[in-house]
Each structure stands twice: as structure tokens, then as C-alpha cells.
Amino acid sequence: YFGVPVKSAEFPFADVTGAETVNRWDETYNGDKWRPTTGALSAFVGYQITNDAKTEPTEVYNFEGKLNVGDASVALTKTPSVNYSGTNLVSNSYTAAIPISTDAMTFPSGAEQTVYLFNTGTRDQWRKLNGQAINQDGYRSGQYLAVPVNLGGQDNFPDRIPSTHAFLLQTTASGTLNINYSKLIKNTAVNRGDGTQIVTRSVDSNNNTS
């Protein structure tokens, strides 16, 4: 899952080997939530990308556009009579990391104050888990890691959401997530307490994600 690190940008399909498919998560839709995208991608919206390449691409995507500066207000929706009602996919569209903390993120009434990060893996690995809990040390590929916002950085919980990463939020009522720009911190890879990387992309010293 990913988001653009600018206000708006076309997806750079030619930058990386293979043919990509980009879909947008639509909480309001009843059925397959992953809807085809057309035109420019928007800030703070979560997207899904797949690539038909048989080997892992080594190139870097380049997004051009105006940077997001200042606080962000992100709409969270809760649509009745749809599947996965209240499940919203939000992206970090800043060029710095968002701390998983109550100082950095203010949740609306009705929102679960927990950030869900998708662990390294494929959709097929997620499907085969079929929503089951994993009662073992470590995290399985295709599993979500739930991080309570008041526990970010404690024990084995990561403390930040790097630029371009997307994360799931659950809410029982529509409202607005507020992100405090002054609390942003440096990008790093998202790791467990033991240093093991737990999400799909890592950030290098030049703020590139791969």
C-alpha cells in the first residue's frame, strides 16, 4: 500500500520494470473495495500497486509535484450497508515520517486509536491467512500489525509511518483525522523492537523508498 509524497501526481508507470496496476481503496463502495484509478493520484489517499514482473524491480519511482506542508485534515468515512464499513486507507503524503503518537495524530470521535500496518508480503499471502490471528513470535507475511497510537515505539511496536506508506484506520462514525505537521520526524525503515523490518518498503538516506 502506498501514497504519493506530493499534493497530486500522475503515477510514473515508465520508471520501473514491469506493468503496474494501481487501485484506490474506496470505503463507500459495496463490493470489491479496490477501484481502478484514472488521472492524478491524490494526497493522503491510500492506493494499492501490483507489478507483473517476475523479479523484484530495483528502480525508483519518481513523483513530481508540490510538497505538502502544514497540518493535514483527512476525512474518514463510515458508510452503512457496505462491506468493510468504516475501514479507511490513509497514506503519509509528507516527505517526513508521521510519529505513531497522540501528539502527531488526533483521531475523531468513534475512530479506533490504532494504526494497522501491512506486513511484507503479497495479497495471496494475506488471503491464505483468512483473517486468522498468528499466535507465534514474529509476524507472518501478509498479516496486519496493529499499533495502538499510545504504544508507538514501545516494546516491539514501530514508532513511525514513513513517507509514502499507507495505513488502515477503523471508525464507527465519519469524521476527520488531523495530522500535526510540526511533529513530523525523520524517515527510517519501519522495524520491530528487535530491528526486523516489518513492512513492504524501506527508506534510504536520500529519502527514496523501495
Feature names for model-found ranges:
Residues Y1-L184, N191:
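N-terminal exported-region signature
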Residues N180-S210:
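Extended terminal and domain-junction accessory segments
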